Amino acid sequence: MEIRGIGFVGSHTTAHAAMGAFLRDVLGLTPIAVAGVGAALFAASNGDVLAVAPPYEEDGSKERTIGLIVDDLDGAIAELHAAGVETDGISENARWRYSHFRMPDGKLYELVEEQAGRG
């Protein structure tokens, strides 16, 4: 598996509106909309994405992640499974196909594959 880059970084906050305004108005990031994504997304000029979401639930089901870009999501998942790493099912939205997994420290990450024509 080859990690080509970081597709996005996600952050939880209770100051959702203030964070959005700061990212847009002060840092100059561009708001973007992606169908099927509940977080507010902001793009840097090189296309990197910062996601801002409400605080996660106590059970961690809304835990934010770092998305690692791969060219072949199915192949990358197979490599993780071969290494004994569990993943959840493949999900997708208008921009990415993705699957979550936990690093050795227990933190949630995901592998993301850009949808055709969206990279």
Write out the residue ranges for each language-model feature:
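Mid-chain, well-packed structural core segment of small domains
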Residues: 62-84, 91
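N-terminal beta-strand motif that seeds the catalytic metal site of vicinal oxygen chelate
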Residues: 1-18, 64-66, 115-119
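Conserved short beta-strand elements that form part of the metal-binding/catalytic scaffold
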Residues: 29-64, 108-115
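Conserved active-site tyrosine of GNAT-family acetyltransferases
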Residues: 19-26, 80, 106
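Vicinal oxygen chelate
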Residues: 1-2, 81-119
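Short secondary-structure junctions
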Residues: 28-34, 85-90
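Residue-level marker for the onset of beta-strands and adjacent loop->beta junctions
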Residues: 7, 37-38, 64, 86, ...
